[in-house]
Amino acid sequence: MSETAAAQPTEATASKATERFRNGGKAVIATLAANGVDTVFGIPGTHNLEFYRHLPEFGIRAVTPRHEQGAGYGADGYFLVSGKPGVVITTSGPGLTNVITAAATAYAESRPMLILSPGVPTGFERADVGMLHETKDSSGALNRLLVSSQRTRTAEGAAQAVAEAFAMFASSRPVPVHIEVP
């Protein structure tokens, strides 16, 4: 399969997912399922429940360790045994930063990992209003450590970012990617 052919199906699945869903969490999970994801790792928390709420609907299993670092290493190990990119769903703030060590390991070993995190609502970025686990610029911080870290603004943008991550895993050096979904 050529690099271009590998990228095309995921772009189509992102469009298909957002045609049906207005919700960013549901669009992300639908796009994960369309890309063959059957397992995610992470800890459900206040800000990421919209991801977890849709997992059963798409037949995706959640593995919930006791610490986010364990989720990151679980996703990395999942790739080693399955050959599929590992997916981590974190909470914002400390939940996200706890995954960084596992992501750095995956980066050094050229292993694909998709890190999904919630973010403050659109319009409140860098507002410093005291929201729970508010961080000034999660994507900016991770962008210095990973090849790609981006914040999406819409359900369509979130699904497209997930599709692009899977296209990148198939067409270039497979390393961790972070997507922040408000």
Per-region residue spans from a language model:
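N-terminal alpha/beta PP-like core and its mobile active-site loop of ThDP/TPP-dependent enzymes
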Residues: 2-182
